[in-house]
Amino acid sequence: MDQLLYRPKEAAKVLNMSRDKLYDLIRAGRITSVKDGRARFITADAMIAYVRQLEAEAAEAA
């Protein structure tokens, strides 16, 4: 990931999910987002943290 900020559509593509699913995760507090004016962005760090959280949950379930 070379970019620091991703628009929701871009972040959803990187995470291989729909934009609606991404917004559900943002509302649930599982992925953080930032706003610059009216524009919403997801940071690269937030996406990495989400993937690490998924890995930790999978390890606990195993």
Regions found by a protein language model. Give the residues of each.
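Polyanion-binding surface elements
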Residues: 1-20, 52-53
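Short amphipathic alpha-helical segments
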Residues: 8, 41-42
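Short linear sequence elements within intrinsically disordered, low-complexity coil regions
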Residues: 11, 27-28, 46, 55
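A short, Lys/Arg-enriched interface patch at domain edges and termini
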Residues: 45-62
